Amino acid sequence: MGNQTDRDSVPSAGVSFMSARRVAVLYGGISEERAVSLVSGQQVVAALREAGYEVTPVEVGADLRDTIAALTPAPDVVFNALHGRFGEDGAIQGVLDWLGIPYTHSGVRASAIAMDKAAARTAFLAAGLPVAEGRLVTVEELAEQDPLPRPFVIKPANEGSAVGVHILHEGDNRRTEIARRWSFGGQALVEEYIPGRELTVGVLNDRALTVTDIRPRSAFYDYESKYAEGGSRHILPAQMHPDAFKRALDVALAAHHALGCRGATRSDFRYDDTRGEPGRLVLLEVNTQPGLTPTSLLPEQAALMGMDFVSLCRWMVEQATCRA
């Protein structure tokens, strides 16, 4: 069965704790994931204050000028606790590079590619990583006919937290209605549906942490399952064939590097073991801004490896950088 990696594999800090004292925490934002970011931000603010930093919470809204004003004078580091559009897609990263302020998590390019699921899929294919069959389709194409054999998944190309995701099985007649109500741009990403289990692997720079087996209370690991208390059960380390366990760690690390990520990421997988073990492992996406809420997966994995939440947040601050 699967085993966690050694505790001494958790990466050490890149710079000294004393080199950064003043930290601004960006949270909230303008995406569909604003509510999640508000919770993440509050958790991070409390943790960094406990760690001894001077913390300025900055609730981000629609006016960029307000955010820039809140970062003047510049802090030593910006902790990016935003999720979704503007916070996770390279936009705020570009602003912070322009301002010359070091920030946590990935830079502009990696963030932009990871947020664009079709672009990320292309990068994963180029790196030889296992992905589901799929393609981009226009909303008009989706309305006219099934783009893939059923069952298949419809998802926005640029959203996270399972926002806007639909699974269509045989006999499900919602396709036309989904296309009519689609509010995520003129295209959708459709992929074959992979049966089996939902897995995730956290990565801190050059180390994959462990594999979590996610058991949602509902049939689908949706937004409610991700963030509601009791919405899902997390089994870590995942109980699975050791070869598949190691493969998940290796693919997560390779995906992190394929996109050029830095700091913390979390790779999500489907694992089809319906025909026995070892099963088929399929990479879904890399999250460059993993959730930091009380039910979030990355903090759980870090804790299993001996890194509590305060230490995890401190580590993220110590890894902060920019391209200015």
Residue ranges and their predicted role:
Residues 1-109, 113-115, 119, 126, ...:
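ATP-binding N-terminal substructure of ATP-dependent carboxylate-amine bond-forming enzymes
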Residues 170-250, 278-282:
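Phosphate-binding site of ATP-dependent enzymes
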Residues 37, 132-133, 152-178, 198:
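Glycine-rich phosphate-binding loop of ATP-grasp-fold ATP-dependent ligases
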Residues 124-125, 148-163, 185-199:
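ATP-grasp fold ATP-binding core
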Residues 137, 165-171, 202-205, 272, ...:
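Short beta-strand-to-turn element immediately C-terminal to the catalytic PLP-Schiff-base lysine
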Residues 2-3, 14, 125, 242-324:
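ATP-dependent carboxylate activation and anion-phosphoryl transfer catalytic cores
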Residues 55, 102-103, 131, 152, ...:
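Hydrophobic beta-strand scaffold residues
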